[in-house]
């Protein structure tokens, strides 16, 4: 029996209309097919499967190994299947002899398809990175998975799980002011975004993204982001970019001194591919 808490998300609509191209026909039979498609915002469509970090429990599978392995495989299979329609799910699988609790979460700007593509990589990756550990957390840039066996002793792990600060530092171009302004909006933003704790904003030349674990209430989410901002300020200092991963939330920022690249996250860029077939006439 599995206990579940899933939150569903609608997949964004994409205009797939096509525009025909007309060319003159001179002594040839011209057949063409032209189809247009949209390339979504780069952050939402790519770069979500890069490994950020992983942590593995010290305890490993012991007798009965087969029972634990089967239970864990069942849990990972369920988490993967749920990611087809949800961006967050947590549940437990097993009985008194072998039970596992687990969850996954996808980044708030990923479509259902990209969420599934991201999560489906995690079972094999966690097996390769953590082997027979009774607990693991594997974080990709677009999603993460976490699981542990019932009865595994929890380490008093710090609130900060992982940080990555750019070695490049910003010069005197108003960076501190713009980043401070962006950080100031985070706590309120995750509370009022209406997007289940996901927040993305641009302040001047600073692009910022923040997300809380979906089972946090508004106050817990706000507190998590306040702590993440403090870590970013203390640890990343003047770095032009930083990624902060807390126990139940994440914060990232990037400073673009030459201006944020122009992208259209709603409509994407339209391309048209044409295929031609020429049938010539011979005398």
List the model feature ranges, each with a label.
Residues 2-283:
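Extracellular secretory-pathway ectodomains and N-terminal mature segments of eukaryotic proteins
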């Amino acid at each position: 029996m599995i206990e579940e808490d899933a939150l569903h998300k609608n997949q964004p609509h994409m205009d797939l209309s096509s525009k025909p191209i007309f060319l003159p026909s001179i002594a040839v039979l011209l057949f063409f097919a032209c189809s247009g498609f949209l390339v979504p915002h780069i952050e939402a469509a790519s770069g979500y499967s890069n490994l950020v970090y992983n942590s593995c429990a010290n305890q490993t599978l012991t007798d009965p190994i087969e029972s634990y392995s089967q239970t864990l495989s069942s849990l990972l299979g369920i988490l993967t299947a749920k990611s087809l329609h949800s961006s967050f799910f947590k549940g437990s699988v097993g009985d008194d002899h072998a039970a596992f609790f687990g969850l996954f979460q996808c980044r708030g700007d990923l479509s259902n398809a990209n969420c599934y593509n991201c999560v489906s990589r995690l079972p094999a990756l966690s097996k390769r990175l953590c082997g027979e550990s009774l607990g693991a957390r594997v974080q990709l840039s677009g999603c993460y998975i976490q699981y542990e066996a019932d009865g595994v002793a929890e380490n008093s792990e710090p609130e900060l799980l992982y940080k990555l600060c750019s070695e490049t530092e910003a010069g005197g171009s108003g960076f501190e002011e713009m980043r401070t302004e962006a950080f100031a909006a985070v706590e309120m933003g995750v509370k009022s975004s209406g997007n289940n704790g996901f927040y993305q904003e641009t302040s001047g030349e600073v692009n910022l993204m923040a997300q809380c674990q979906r089972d946090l209430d508004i106050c817990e989410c706000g507190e998590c982001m306040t702590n993440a901002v403090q870590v970013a300020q203390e640890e990343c200092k003047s770095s032009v970019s930083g990624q902060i991963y807390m126990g139940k939330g994440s914060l990232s920022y990037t400073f673009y001194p030459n201006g944020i690249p122009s992208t259209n996250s709603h409509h994407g860029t339209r391309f048209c591919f044409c295929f031609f077939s020429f049938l010539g006439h011979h005398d």
